[in-house]
Amino acid sequence: MDLRHNGRNNEYVTNQRSLCSPKSVNYKMSAKKFRHITVTAVVIANMVGTGVFTSLGFQLLDIRSGFVLLMLWAVGGLAALCGAMTYAELGAAMPRSGGEYNFLTRIYHPAAGFVSGWVSVTIGFAGPVALAAMTFAAYATTVMPGEPSAILEKSLAAGLLIILTCVHATNRRNSGAIQLIFTILKVAVIVLFCIAAIVLVDSPQPVNFFPSEGDGALLTSGEFAVALIYVSYAYAGWNAATYLSSELEEPQRTLPWILMTGTLVVMTLYVALNFVFLYAASMDSMAGELEVGYIAAEVAFGDVGGRFTGIVLAMLLVSTVSAMTMAGPRVIQVIGEDFPTIGVLGRKNKDGIPANAIILQSSIAMLFILSSTFESILVFAGFTLALNSFATVLGIFILRWKQPDLERPYRTFLYPLPPLIYLTLTGWTLWFVLLSRPVEGLFGLGIIGSGLLLYFFSSFKAANTT
C-alpha cells in the first residue's frame, strides 16, 4: 500500500482499496476533544495500578538486594521514558487515534497494523483491564471479615468492569471527569502514603539501598531481565495518549509533553513507592504475595490503618480499569473504520463514543477474569505488549529513512539514543523471558501468529468476493 502524506493538514491517502485492507480515507480529527490535562491523567492512570501494587512480591522471589530492586524500577522508567520520547515524534507526525495500530500500518504494512490491533483486542488492553480488576478485588477482600473467597473476588472484579463499561460507553463528559478525579486522588494518596509510612514506621527494615558486593552480577543476570518484564508491565500505559490522538486538542503540540510528563511523574512515584514498601515491611513477608501495599501499610499503620489503606488502594485501582476502558477501545474503533468486514466496531454513538468497541474489549476482559490466573495473564501480557512496542520504536528509523520530508512537529530529543536504549533494554528482556518462561513467551508469539493468519484469511476472502 502506498501512503502519501499531505504536509499541510497531516492527512494520509492511499492508492489501494479493498474490503479487507484499510479503506481509502482521509484520516480526520474528531470534532469533540479531550483536554490535555485529561489525557495526561489517562497516561498516569494507565501506568499506576496493577503492576506497582503487585510486582514487588514476584521480584522478591529471585532478588533480595534493595539497590537492585530499586534499579529495576529506575531502569524500567528509563526505558519507558525513551519509548515515550520516540512515540512522541511518531504521534505528532501521525496524529490519529489508534496508537501502535496507526503507526505500524503506516510504517510497515496494513498486516502489521492489523496484528498490532489484534494484540490490543485480545491481550493489550483486555488482559490489563482484567488484572487491574482482579487486583482491586484482591485488595478489597483483604479488608473484609472472614477468609477471602475466590468466588467473591471474581464477582467484585466482574461487577467493577460492568459498571465502568456502562459509564464509558454512554457519556464522554462523565468519562473524562471521572478519569481526572480518580487520577488526582491516586497520585495524592501515593504521595501521602509514602510520607506517612516513612514518618510512622518504628523500626525500618535493615535493607541496604546502596550498591554492595554481588549487585553488579545481579544487574546483568537473567533474573534481573525476567523481573524487568514485571516492571515493563507496570510501566505499560506510557503510550496511552497515542490512542486518543484524534480526540486531543492540538496533538502535534501537546502530545509529546503529555507522554513525557506522565512518564516522569510515574517513574518518580514508582521508585518512591517501592522504597517505602522495602523500608516498612520485611522481604520475607512480601515475597510471593500479591497485596504488597496492604502488607506494608499494616506494618506502618497497624491493623486498622492497614485495612483503611487496603480500601483506599482498592478504590484507586478503579481509575486504572477506567483509564484502559477509555483508551483501549479507540484502537478497536480505528480498526473497524479501516476494515469494512468488521466495520461495526468502528461505529460511534451520538456522543462520539465507540460503544461497540468498549463492549467488545470488556467482554474479553470478563473472560480473562472468569477463566485465567493472575500470574499467567501478567507474564504473557507483559511479553506481548513489550514486543508490540519494540516493533513500533524500531519503526522510527524506518520512517525517517522512507519519509525524510514528512512534517515532524516534534523530533525525538537526543535521537537516536532514546530508541536505541529502549530497543536494547526491551530486546534483552524479551530474550530472557523466552528462555526462562517459554510457555508464556510462545503463547504471546502464538497470538501474533494468529493475527497474521486472520489478516491473510480475510484478505483472501475479500479478494474472492470482489
List PLM regions with ranges.
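Hydrophobic alpha-helical segments and their helix-loop junctions in multi-pass secondary transporters
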Residues: 184-213, 275-281, 394-406, 434, ...
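A generic transmembrane alpha-helix motif of multi-pass inner-membrane proteins
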Residues: 380, 384, 416-466
